[in-house]
Regions:
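Catalytic phosphate/nucleotide-handling subdomain of diverse soluble enzymes
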Residues: 98-158
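A broadly conserved detector of short glycine/acidic/proline-rich loop/turn motifs that flank catalytic sites
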Residues: 24, 94, 122-123
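Active-site/ligand-binding loops adjacent to catalytic centers
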Residues: 3-89, 133-158
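Short glycine/serine- and small hydrophobic-enriched flexible loop segments
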Residues: 1-5, 58, 99-106
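Substrate-binding/catalytic subdomain of NAD(P)-dependent oxidoreductase enzymes
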Residues: 16, 76-83, 87-106, 114-116
Length: 158
């Protein structure tokens, strides 16, 4: 919870609004109750009964924050967007923070010109099968293992 401590010590001029985003199939904060059988492609947030439930609710309330949820389809679309546009290969659970920020900025819930920080802690290699299943692989090509062949294959397929 270091934000409050930094603010109280005079090391920060304000505290952030804390937002929480959950997958629709594992969204106890949205439902207001435990989810007995949470299900989502985002395995790192497949949690139906968070251990820090009370702390998360308190922090959200104190910071004027909120919770929201996203479908697996939205989460995967954001994971793909991050890879294609930013070169960031994160796991689905990390992509949800960006999905939330984008939606809330677009809707005006997050005001224009706000500073926004999205934490993406999970690398895409934590869940490579999900990422691979989302790829349009096209057809495979065989090449000789030389730099010239690799370069030619890339340039020929752009």
């Amino acid at each position: 919870m270091g934000y409050t401590e930094y603010f109280e010590a005079g090391k920060a001029s304000s505290t952030p609004t804390m937002l929480g985003y959950q997958a629709e199939g594992a969204a106890p904060f949205i439902k207001g109750s435990r989810v007995e059988k949470p299900e989502t492609i985002a395995t790192a947030i497949r949690i139906g009964n968070p251990q820090s439930w009370d702390q998360a609710l308190k922090l959200s309330k104190e910071s004027n924050g909120w919770f929201d949820s996203f479908s697996d389809k939205e989460i995967l679309a954001t994971q793909k967007l991050l890879t294609e546009k930013e070169g960031i290969f994160c796991e689905p659970a990390s992509a949800i923070s960006v999905a939330g920020a984008l939606r809330d900025i677009k809707s005006g819930k997050i005001p224009d010109h706000s500073s926004v920080v999205c934490t993406l802690t999970g690398h895409g290699l934590k869940d490579p099968d999900t990422a691979i299943s989302q790829c349009d692989t096209g057809s495979m090509i065989n090449i000789n293992p030389t730099l010239d062949e690799v370069k030619k294959a890339i340039l020929d397929n752009m």
